[in-house]
């Protein structure tokens, strides 16, 4: 069974990242590699995590012309990752091209999910980039576009999960960042929830970074989270 917990490796160097990885169990959590760490360490670091039998979510949020995104998704799949993502705002043709690029992998292909609205966005900010929808409206609209394109699911704030499930179906995967423990500050995330709240809303996978990576005892935090989930 795939763990519900995805630990975000938000580090700026390999030593610190691997020190945390050494304390984690691939049976208990997946790992997320984002733009900072991938830019610094590249594909070899991802391959090392896969070699250690972790499921890896490669969080690079591809957004470009359809052909470029398709090739990027194919290259990501070659690394053996479990999940990759693209920006839903790239449009239907881009999403379809990304999906088609993974067909050759058959049942071994990575999950392909789309980013709806970043959890750092606050109500009203969409208008500054020319979008008149509210946050829930925009997230739901993009989720439905991703479903139409044949993607497996979306990245979405827990606040939008329930309506996305209603519109796109219970089997449509929701990956939820912006998860904070009750005693944590929001940091630069605006729309946050605790793990228990997010699961109640219907989130399938929870992405948790700083509450684990900045903890004095990360293993203890992970164990407590798993007990709660």
From Swiss-Prot:
A GO molecular function held by the record: orotidine-5'-phosphate decarboxylase activity
What are the cysteine partners in each disulfide bond?
none
Which pathway does UniProt place it in?
Pyrimidine metabolism; UMP biosynthesis via de novo pathway; UMP from orotate: step 2/2
EC number of the protein: 4.1.1.23
- Record GO cellular component, one term: cytosol
UniProt cross-references to InterPro entries, sorted A to Z = Aldolase_TIM, OMPdecase, OMPdecase_AS, OMPdecase_bac, OMPdeCOase_dom, RibuloseP-bd_barrel
HAMAP family the record matches: OMPdecase_type1_B (MF_01200_B)
The task this protein performs is described as:
Catalyzes the decarboxylation of orotidine 5'-monophosphate (OMP) to uridine 5'-monophosphate (UMP).
Q: How does it assemble?
A: Homodimer.
Spell out the protein name for this chain.
Answer: Orotidine 5'-phosphate decarboxylase
Q: Which organism is it from?
A: Legionella pneumophila (strain Paris)
UniProt gene name: pyrF
């Amino acid at each position: 069974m795939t763990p519900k917990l995805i630990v975000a490796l938000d580090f700026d160097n390999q030593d610190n990242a691997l020190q945390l990885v050494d304390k984690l169990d691939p049976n208990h959590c997946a790992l997320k590699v984002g733009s900072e760490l991938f830019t610094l360490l590249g594909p070899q670091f991802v391959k090392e995590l896969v070699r250690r039998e972790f499921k890896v979510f490669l969080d690079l949020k591809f957004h470009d012309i359809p052909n470029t995104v398709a090739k990027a998704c194919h290259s990501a799949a070659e690394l053996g990752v479990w999940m990759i993502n693209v920006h839903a705002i790239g449009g239907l043709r881009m999403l379809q091209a990304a999906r088609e690029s993974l067909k050759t992998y058959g049942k071994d292909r990575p999950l392909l999910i789309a980013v709806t609205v970043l959890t750092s966005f606050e109500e009203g900010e969409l208008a500054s980039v020319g979008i008149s929808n509210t946050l829930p409206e925009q997230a739901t609209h993009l989720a439905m576009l991703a479903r139409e394109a044949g993607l497996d699911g979306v990245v979405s704030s827990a606040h939008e999960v329930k309506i996305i499930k209603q519109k796109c179906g219970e089997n449509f995967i929701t990956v939820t960042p912006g998860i904070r423990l009750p005693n944590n500050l929001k940091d630069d995330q605006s729309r946050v929830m605790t793990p228990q709240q997010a699961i109640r809303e219907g989130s399938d996978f929870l992405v948790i970074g700083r509450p684990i990576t900045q903890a004095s005892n990360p293993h203890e935090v992970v164990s407590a989270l798993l007990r709660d989930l």
